[in-house]
Regions:
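Glycine-rich beta-strand-centered segment in the early N-terminal region that forms part
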Residues: 24-40, 50-96
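Short glycine/threonine/proline-enriched tight-turn/helix- or strand-capping micro-motif at secondary-structure
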Residues: 16-24
Length: 96
């Protein structure tokens, strides 16, 4: 499967401000993967980030409990995690 060069996202650009953006897909190495996100949890820290209470660098795409399908994966990552392209996974935030 050929992957697109960009991905659409709603990006937090400041307190209470989102902007639609096409972002370049990152290159992956042997130890990383690219996830086609289907859903993502929004928790208290995301709300604080949106409100401007949690001071984090912007721009940023909120959400850090993603669920999706592996679109591309490096060989070492595939062996270490026991997953492959096409597998549906939920990502632990400590691993992201």
């Amino acid at each position: 499967m050929t992957l697109p060069k960009t991905s659409f996202a709603m990006v937090l650009t400041g307190p209470r401000t989102f902007a639609p953006m096409d972002l370049p897909l990152p290159e992956i190495d042997d130890d990383s993967a690219l996830l086609r996100v289907e859903a993502c949890g929004i928790c208290g820290s995301d709300v604080e980030q949106y409100e401007g209470v949690l001071r984090t660098p912007v721009p940023v795409v909120p959400g850090h409990e993603p669920l999706g399908t592996i679109a591309k994966i490096g060989d070492r990552a595939a062996r270490r995690l026991g997953v492959d392209v096409g597998d549906r996974v939920a990502v632990e935030t400590i691993l992201a």
